[in-house]
Design a protein with these regions (language model features):
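Residues in well-ordered beta-strands of folded domains
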Residues: 39-41, 54, 64, 84, ...
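Anionic-ligand binding region
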Residues: 48-83, 91-93
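Short, solvent-exposed loop/turn segments at secondary-structure junctions
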Residues: 6-12, 45, 68-70, 86-90, ...
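Structured loop/turn residues at beta-strand edges in well-structured enzyme cores
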Residues: 1, 58, 119
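Central helical "cap/lid" subdomain
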Residues: 1-53, 115
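Generic secondary-structure boundary/loop-capping signal
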Residues: 12-13, 24-27, 37, 52, ...
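Conserved flavin/dinucleotide-binding core of flavoenzymes
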Residues: 76-181
Length: 181
């Protein structure tokens, strides 16, 4: 049967090696930066002068109040915040347990300008995204290989944005359809 593999490049390379070698080599040529994330909830909204921030220096690169997003629960208890670590900080801490890095990220949140006196959270959870930020896309033009046809798709095929992932998926589906006719 035909298939489209949309896993991150390094995972796709392992899945396809020895099975679809041209696609495996294309996938292996990609590289990623990791991103550690934390979700923190407070019983009451902390004193924070903003609801989202992109941060240039330090352990964190992005912070957002989840309750403030359109279509989400209004800013009532619990107050939920998403913390993303910088690529360099994430790379340094990627092998740590989430129970170790999430409190460090919470501490960094408490030290940001405009954040005052954080109460202890009612919830704190960390998550590892090993393949979060595409640093190098594949240089291969190969999209589909073999019989039955297997195609590759993802942000690592065309560019590090969701639009590129979508476009790549459409192209992969078209390549599969063409290979079947």
């Amino acid at each position: 049967r035909q298939a489209i593999c949309t896993a991150p490049g390094p995972q796709t390379a392992k899945l396809l090696e020895g099975f679809r070698p041209t696609l495996a080599m294309a996938a292996a040529s990609t590289s990623y930066a990791p991103c550690l994330a934390a979700m923190v909830a407070f019983a009451e909204r902390p004193t924070v002068e903003w609801c989202a921030a992109s941060i240039q220096d330090g352990p964190l690169s992005f912070v957002a109040e989840d309750n403030a997003r359109p279509g989400h629960q209004p800013a009532l208890a619990p107050s939920r915040w998403i913390l993303h670590a910088s690529a360099s900080w994430s790379a340094e801490h990627i092998e740590e347990n989430p129970e170790v890095f999430a409190p460090l990220m919470l501490e960094a949140f408490g030290q940001l300008p405009g954040v005052q006196d954080l109460d202890p959270p009612v919830h704190l959870r960390g998550h590892r995204w090993r393949f979060a930020l595409v640093e190098k896309t594949t240089t291969s033009a190969a999209q589909v290989e073999g019989t039955p046809p297997v195609a590759i798709a993802g942000d690592w095929c065309e560019g590090p944005r969701i639009e590129a992932a979508w476009s790549s998926g459409v192209r992969a589906a078209s390549a599969i359809r063409k290979a079947l006719t």
